[in-house]
Amino acid sequence: MLFSSVFFLFAFLPIVLFFYFIVCKRSMLAKNILLLFASLFFYAWGEPKFVLVMIVSIVANYIFGIAINKQLTAYENKGRLAKIILVLSVIFNLSILFIFKYLNFTLFNLNLIFKNIFPQTEILLPIGISFFTFQAMSYVIDVYRKTVDVQKNPLYLALYISFFPQLIAGPIVRYSTIEEQISSRTVTGADFSEGIRRFLIGLSKKVILANNFALVADQAFNIVGNNNISIAFAWLGSIAYTMQIFFDFSAYSDMAIGLGRMFGFKFLENFNYPYVSSSVSEFWRRWHISLGQWFRDYVYIPLGGSRVPNKVLVIRNLLIVWLLTGIWHGANWTFILWGLLYFALLAFEKIMGIPNKFESKQSKVLYAIFTFLMVNFGWVLFRSNNLLQAGIYLKAMFGLGDVIGIDNMFYQYFGEYWMFFFVGAVYSTGIFSYLRKRLSKIDILDRIIEFLGIAVYTVLFLISVSYLVMGAYNPFIYFNF
């Protein structure tokens, strides 16, 4: 089920809110059970058979958590068995991911090498499996580390793993973030209104901006294989996808955070205007923050992080993290190469001491431009169906081969969508958020902004709904991961 669908907006969400605040208002247990069943229904709406995969994951990780906690508390000085259980839990979770996400890819490539000696499988990918599996893994690991208390109520743990706002495409919520909120939370009028505001921002970003950028990007990537793309349209298409993936993914996070707020949950931010970054390392502190923190805390730091005896080990740790990051995003060589690209860029920055090495404003600005270009090239890899398409597209961007500089398709699409590019570029700088915070410090302006905000969000909602009713392009990119 999509957040940006008529059924979700006008049926599912209103019904869940009604039962949550009216029927179940006196019991936290009843509220949590309602949200759990709503979440299972939400997931089963599009993939009824795969809800069993998630239930198996929930049950298994509940048992792993209980077993580890029992060993740690009953045998304080004998945590060896607890460690074995932890390893088994990691193997179990990674096995689920491998079977559903990587087995097809692995067998296909092995058959290329060994002349089709393995049967080819066509296992379908459960939506959001990477997200709820990483949440489940982090919970069990944190129980072992004693950074969270074990959740003894299986329904509450099930709610944590399956909660519908962040189930499909994040953010990856740590159990420590909502540990207390699961059993005790309140929703004030300010919380609910802020949740609505944040949800409407996300809905507008998705339907009005991301979906329109997608029309440009899809056209560019669809025609590139026929060598019919000009240099100008190749660049326009790549920038369109750069904008699309930001507004698409951050929109989902906005809606997830807003929905969570409506029900009393406060999730951490997942994006912080990444395209204004002055370096690649800063970009990854601003982009998909929850994933970066997950790999930092559960892979990079356990390997030794940057506190290892020499830079060779630092580079090794970066290589492992970014290879895994690429693989996490999908079973395709394009994602693996995308991860390795960021490994190379981050290793370069680590070795050279960038951006701290720059002293002049000009050098910092130039490196910020370089960073954006590298991110843009990375998204070409990310969007391409295979390495061949990525190579052809990048060649077209640099005018290599039989391509022309500019064509009618560029004029057509730029003429039709230039306003979306302008609004997207301005919004991605964070200037709107900055001005809102500064002006809100003045009482009279704060009241004016609040009044105008209601009108603006109402208009944006109506425009978004009109797009949805017309059946506009709508799926979220990160549903595939």
Regions found by a protein language model. Name each.
Residues 1-480:
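Membrane-embedded transmembrane alpha-helical bundles that form the catalytic cores
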